[in-house]
């Protein structure tokens, strides 16, 4: 582990964290996406893994990070840009890992400002071939216009929802067999219903009292938790848009959100407020 720039207590915490990652990694099913991310981080100094909630961004990033230890990299899990500047060591191969870069449900302006302030310093550090960054990022955060102010993190994107990166039916079946064991065959017709299939498998694995077919067909508890988190995270804009989608039966017109709307539409909205 890192000895020169990282405090001993942080080293101990990271060692414990890596042991937990290794234990959790026993449930990882090797995918084409994971192989692609590994190839990208080996040939690029900074890689951002994007996708919607539950598609396996964090799990994939951690799996690839563990593989990089085989190339002599020390792994350091950080939450802010100052840590990268503080703990970077030109004499050691270091892979910095970041979860939910710049926010979860919406782009967090405070986080963005921090990364903007340190952007050039970090860019300079990455000129050292032994220093790399791998981050996971929600797609709605990554696609925010302001995220373009961080070109380091847009230079190499691995979007787990793209056709060449998304899980194949064979990979989904292997994941189901890993987590559901004998129940995997019961849900084979539902594996393509939701992008967050990997999350559903993990949730079922953690609570096997659930009825497998009902859960994978209609995972209402997952939706409920995500909606609650939108409110908790104060993502009021997205919360309101979701409400509008429900009110208008998922038939929102773009001009209703970007232009002045007529009185009839205003009355419909007021009626449901």
Identify the residue ranges that each predicted region occupies.
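Structural recognition of the conserved hydrophobic beta-strand(s) that form the central parallel beta-sheet
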Residues: 98-99, 130-139
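Substrate-engagement module of ASCE P-loop NTPases
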Residues: 117-131
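Walker A/P-loop nucleotide-binding motif
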Residues: 43-61
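Conserved P-loop NTPase "ATPase switch" module shared by AAA+ and STAND
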Residues: 78-83, 88-117
